[in-house]
Amino acid sequence: MNGGHIQLIIGPMFSGKSTELIRRVRRYQIAQYKCVTIKYSNDNRYGTGLWTHDKNNFEALEATKLCDVLESITDFSVIGIDEGQFFPDIVEFCERMANEGKIVIVAALDGTFQRKPFNNILNLIPLSEMVVKLTAVCMKCFKEASFSKRLGEETEIEIIGGNDMYQSVCRKCYIDS
């Protein structure tokens, strides 16, 4: 076995996916692994680099397709990917990198605001050695929240925003609103 594998961190908005991604990448950095992080370039809410909702920043390459950064990451053994649901080539890229012996850590929304699978991110589950589904706190009743609820009436899937546009909600609050 070449040591390559895929770790998938999924959950709703505000569940700490990016924070967990950064924690895992930092852990490998401490162990002297050569690490790189990639973020979706259309997510420019807070500036350059990878940002968490609580304003923690981490250096990251930016791309709209992962294949565009292939040449830049050949020397790295750990690849962190934030907002994985937005990359159209996420499944093929992760499988290729893991097969080449790299550790790939992906943070992604598992469902849309309509509680549908988010693009093809769920296709990574059978290819992953480790899958963690995080929960948030329901912003209405303060129970465990597994879903992201959009506050506006827009119907397109890819609308990037924070707590001005989305809430994490439990099942009951999702259905009631």
Curated annotation (Swiss-Prot):
Entries under Gene3D superfamilies matching the protein: 3.30.60.20, P-loop containing nucleotide triphosphate hydrolases
Domain of life: Viruses
Endoplasmic reticulum recorded as keyword: no
Amino acids binding substrate: 113, 157-161
Enzyme class: transferase
EC number: 2.7.1.21
Sequence positions that bind ATP: 11-18
Catalytic residues of the enzyme: 83
Catalytic activity line of the entry: thymidine + ATP = dTMP + ADP + H(+)
Keywords from the UniProt entry: ATP-binding, Disulfide bond, DNA synthesis, Kinase, Metal-binding, Nucleotide-binding, Transferase, Zinc
Function: Phosphorylates thymidine and thymidine analogs, such as azidothymidine (AZT). Part of the salvage pathway for pyrimidine deoxyribonucleotide synthesis.
Family as reported in the entry's similarity comment: Belongs to the thymidine kinase family.
Protein name: Thymidine kinase
